[in-house]
A protein has these predicted regions:
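Conserved, well-structured ligand/cofactor-binding cores
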Residues: 1-98
Length: 99
């Protein structure tokens, strides 16, 4: 792999694409579970992003996270929703968290 960076997690070091917005665990899932070579549909990913933003707002109201944390999550969600970031969600649709 050219143009990579080294990421570290509890399982050790791993090379991931330099521009990737994900880390070692996602790369391990991609490498270890090439089941269907189909990615999660963009509509599902967008719905999940909206759910994460809503959860952040609720958790701010419930004082489970700070306002700054909630704002950061909502801002990140808005960036993901308005840009073209689907390449950064590479895990196979049938990989179910076992990686």
């Amino acid at each position: 792999m050219s143009n990579t960076r080294i990421e570290r997690d509890s399982m050790g070091e791993l090379r991931v694409p330099e521009a990737a917005l994900y880390g070692a665990q996602t790369q391990r899932a991609v490498d270890n579970f090439p089941i269907s070579h189909q990615r999660m549909p963009a509509q599902f990913i967008r719905a999940l992003i909206l759910a994460k933003a809503a959860a952040a707002q609720a958790n701010v109201e419930l004082k489970q996270i700070s306002a700054a944390q909630g704002e950061a999550i909502v801002e990140a969600a808005q960036i993901l929703l308005t840009g073209d970031f689907m390449e950064h969600f590479p895990v196979d649709i049938f990989q179910t968290g076992s990686g």
